[in-house]
Amino acid sequence: MEFVSIEGLRQDGRRASEHRFCLAKFENAIARTTCDGSAQFQLGQTFAIASVFGPSQSQSKAQEVYQEGLKVTCECSSTSFASELAIARVGNSSTNGSTDKEANITKARTQSLRSERRNKEIAKKFERILTTAIDIRRFPRSELHVSCACVNDDGSAIACMFNAVVLALVDAGVPTFDTYCAMCATRLDGEKLLDCNDLEERGRGVEVFCVSETRNVLEEENDYDLGNFRNVDDTSEKRIVYYEVTGGKCSAETIDGLIRLCVKGSEDVSKVMRVAMNKRFRRLQSTRY
């Protein structure tokens, strides 16, 4: 399959360095009345929601004694109809024959186990990232619970879920060192593709998931140990909080190029997130009096 045409266009009409339409909103309709902060984020057809509970006092008294800062726990999930495989499974469930039905049941169980294992891995990643990004020293002997779910998965679901979590933290008033943004990129047909969709993810190319800060790093802040640095262009420098390479092996130059592409895309997506934050703050300020 040709992922990039001769004209330099992808299957959905985008250029290699273009991301899909993104939309950021606060207060998702599912948990806005029961949580301290909630948000939803959409990247193309990929849609994710997130909720934040806390910070609150730790439930375990024995754990309070040894806990110096905020403990962050994450829970990630995905709906049964989020992926295209689930839709195909529903369509095949109407076929006749006990053999086909047993095969469909086995396939459904296997897919469920894979999704559950993948969600647990994503939750562990988010816990490590948020522990670094949040100022945990302000909340000693406390805990914070983050819940996120992917409603529709059309590629780059992990980046969409993380951006929803960042917005939910802002809605809950949890202090972070900066506004963070995540983006995915892959390499297919010798081209570096930003914000890969579901079709490009199934191309089994090298994929990079990157979380970076949105502000430029100042010279006097270089001693602040939070992550690595990447020059986006000649005038800006971003701090990389976390990145992960999956899907195979490639050269260091390729990985560096994919990370730079992710940081450049995160810079554009963060502008949409900041617009949503400003609207949220103005709304809260108007309802205060």
Residue spans of the language-model regions?
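Polyanion-binding surfaces on beta-sheet-dominated domains and ring/shell assemblies
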Residues: 1-289
